[in-house]
């Protein structure tokens, strides 16, 4: 889904359902200080920056199809799916290594922004206004989908709003280039992206696409809801019985398919109809300092939170599973309490910032 990595604004606009695991960060405050020797982590950071600059200076180039990892990939696909190896080589020979994608992947918005900065960009007045306009335009279909699936229409609209600003920015990278670049030259997550490349090749065959013309995010996410190829194959649905091409799933231009597919994704991940996503809380300072935004698990109960000094208003049962989520404001640390549906949203994009943004945009649209 958002893996969602160049300027902060560009990064935010290119969020996908495939975002990396977020890292805990705090707003950087400039303060006078004496110069001190660089620590190992600072040196490593400097070296990483130099490496990024070096990669960014490279030009796009074709892949060497004699590389052992690419040969193994072709052989595996050919064997598993009965696709002629020569056909696969012909396709992959047209893929291009894109160095800017590698650089972008090192700077996802979830890593470089505090919550209040992230929210300002994704829950802006303009995005709320466009969301209400979008909802009014598609009100009938959204109402039908909500009644059928139990997935809140506001959440469906918010997902599309956060992902692509209601279809305005679906990405300009060739998906083939993105997935080959990350699958063969981004070691940290190469296995994942090679799997997505496999799904993309199969999806293009299933949907009768020209794989050289499909465009998406720099992480390979596609369409208005930014589905990765594996999610497209598994969760995308034909949302209209009267579609002009029955059985085809068009997440680029068909809003019936787009809205129904987002709802289907949430249904498959056990969205609880009518239940809240999160709520605000007053949290003791010692707990705030220990929070880790990489944690996505409902690792506490509401009763345990109350017992630890967390104050909040809720009529939910004491044994309700929850997560305490860091939510920095412009004035300092803060936290919120996420519930089951919050966890479901993080299955779409593994980021607590993303899930909070979707919830807050949805609430602003009501």
Language model regions located:
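Bacterial N-terminal signal peptides that target proteins for export
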Residues: 1-8
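C-terminal motif of bacterial Sec signal peptides marking the signal peptidase cleavage site
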Residues: 14-17
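Bacterial signal peptide processing site
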Residues: 19-22
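Solvent-exposed loop/turn segments at secondary-structure junctions
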Residues: 95-96, 163-167, 221, 272, ...
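Flexible, glycine-rich surface segments
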Residues: 211, 215-324, 330
């Amino acid at each position: 889904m958002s893996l969602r990595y160049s300027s902060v604004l560009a990064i935010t606009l290119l969020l996908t359902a495939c975002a990396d695991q977020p890292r805990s960060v705090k707003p950087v405050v400039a303060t006078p200080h004496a110069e001190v020797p660089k620590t190992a982590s600072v040196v490593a950071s400097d070296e990483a920056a130099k490496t990024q600059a070096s990669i960014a200076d490279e030009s796009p180039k074709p892949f060497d199809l004699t590389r052992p990892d690419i040969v193994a990939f072709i052989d595996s696909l050919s064997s598993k799916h009965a696709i002629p190896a020569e056909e696969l080589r012909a396709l992959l020979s047209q893929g291009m290594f894109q160095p800017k994608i590698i650089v972008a992947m090192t700077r996802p918005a979830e890593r470089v922004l505090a919550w209040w900065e992230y929210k300002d960009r994704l829950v802006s007045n303009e995005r709320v206004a466009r969301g209400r306009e979008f909802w009014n335009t598609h009100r009938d279909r959204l109402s039908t989908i909500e009644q059928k699936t139990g997935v809140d229409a506001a959440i469906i609209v918010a997902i599309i709003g956060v992902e692509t600003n209601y279809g305005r920015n679906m990405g300009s990278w060739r998906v083939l280039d993105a997935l080959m670049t990350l699958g063969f030259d981004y070691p940290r997550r190469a296995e994942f992206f090679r799997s997505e490349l496999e799904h993309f090749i199969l999806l293009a065959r299933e949907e009768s696409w020209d794989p050289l013309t499909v465009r998406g995010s720099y992480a390979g996410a596609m369409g208005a809801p930014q589905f990765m190829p594996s999610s497209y194959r598994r969760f995308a649905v034909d949302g209209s019985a009267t579609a002009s091409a029955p059985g085809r799933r068009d997440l680029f231009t068909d809003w019936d398919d787009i809205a129904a597919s987002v709802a289907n994704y949430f249904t498959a991940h056990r969205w609880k109809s009518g239940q809240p996503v999160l709520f605000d809380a007053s949290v003791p300072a010692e707990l705030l300092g220990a929070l880790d935004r990489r944690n996505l698990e409902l690792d506490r109960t509401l009763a345990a939170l109350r017992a630890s000094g967390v104050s909040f208003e809720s009529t939910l049962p004491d044994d309700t599973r929850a997560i305490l989520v860091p939510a920095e404001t412009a004035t300092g640390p803060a936290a919120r309490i996420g519930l089951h549906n919050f966890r479901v949203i993080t299955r779409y994009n593994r980021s607590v910032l993303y899930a909070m943004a979707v919830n807050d945009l949805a609430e602003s649209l009501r």
